[in-house]
Amino acid sequence: MRQRLFHSAASLALLCLAAGGALAADDERVVPANEEPRHVVKLENEWVRVIDVEIPEGEQTQYHTHSLDYPYVLVTSVTLYNQIYGQEPKDAKMQAGFVGYYNAVAKGAYTHRFINRGPGTFRAIGIELMKPPSADATPGSALPPVTGAQIVLDNERVGAYRIKLAPGASLGPITIPGPSIRVAMGDGKLADEVEDTRTETRLSPAQFVFQPQTTTATFTNTGATQVELVEFVLK
């Protein structure tokens, strides 16, 4: 009986070691960004793949690779313990409202994983550009100025405007080139009027809408708090 118990305990120990090895191997496994469990694809078409990144405080991602050109906007402010593949991890401050761009075509694919140190949930919207760069793209081609909107990103592939509206304020009519993606930075209420059609929308953080064509619209903040939008424009 004692020998049988010892044999069972030894078998259990070996199983635990095997499971631990599999978990460690899985921790090192690299997946495309759109297959990482907390990078959720919310829209995919011929132009873009829109990824909603949501990481609760204290949780981490798998190693994942950004292999496509990738504009993004940070929706919340946190500290990430970020580890680029093959390097030591280090803290990186994320500031809500920051609009960035990773040029994978020029710099090569970027592989990393991170832990969200908080405070709170990390939230971001990333936009993978599905089409390769145009051969006739002109570096530094200007994004058309829009009265009442701030240009926060402008390169040969994509631009972005930031729009802020106080309660009761309106902007427009303004023309946004298409295709475009509008991202809400927080809660609020927005009315937009396009060709005499008025639409009321209750906004939430990281909510977005894709417009395949150029649109001319008037925006009105119909809520009690400031509305902030980031409008990405594809070139």
Q: What are the roles of these predicted feature ranges?
A:
Residues 1-12:
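Bacterial N-terminal signal peptides that target proteins for export
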Residues 61-63, 81-82, 102, 108-117, ...:
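Short beta-strand His + acidic residue motifs that chelate non-heme Fe in jelly-roll/DSBH
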Residues 37-62, 66-72, 144-182, 231-232:
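A short glycine-rich, His/Asp/Glu-containing loop-to-beta-strand
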Residues 106-130, 178, 187, 212-235:
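Ligand-binding loop in jelly-roll beta-barrel domains
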Residues 44, 86-106, 196-214:
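Short acidic-glycine-tyrosine-enriched beta hairpin
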Residues 22-25:
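Boundary at the C-terminal end of the N-terminal hydrophobic targeting segment
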Residues 67-86, 176-196:
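Glycine- and acidic-residue-biased ligand/ion/polar-headgroup-sensing regions
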Residues 105, 113-166:
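Surface-exposed beta-loop interaction hotspot
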